[in-house]
Amino acid sequence: MARPMDEDETIVKLQGRSQILYRRDHIKADGRSVSLYGFSSPSGLAGLELVGLGNHRSELRRDPLRNTWAIYSPHRQSRTFMPARTADPLAPWRAGSAPTEIPFSEFELAIFDNQFSSLQTGDAGSVPSQWASGPATGHCEVVVYTSESEGDLQSIGQERRVLLIEALIDR
């Protein structure tokens, strides 16, 4: 069900390095954020959105043989892997389609909080371990630079690459 823009959304006009751009910030039902960027002011209602799995625990562990640190994130085993074209979580939402991470039917560029991040935000607390370990804290986002299901950075054109750089600078 689509819902109108509400208190969970804002549209910000930004002065980019090359031109004016807009950012639409949307808070999803699970608390994660989605930011849409474009050279024109974004419009449209939010549609169905994927809801995150909730809390997860990741930890840093030190490998005593290699003297290196590694991130262990068991919850990532349930992440989406090679979905069917009709269940693409990075596709724009369409009426009658499955929920997606981007609950808007039109966008130029989208950045959202990673549902399957190896890192966790906030105070993760300590994880009991007999080895040297600690919380794996940080923030991970997913960048979707086109609403098309085909293409790459070369095929999107220079204007879209400029928008991508402007959005990354804003982040």
Positions of the model-derived regions?
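Active-site microenvironments that recognize anionic phosphate/pyrophosphate groups
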Residues: 2-171
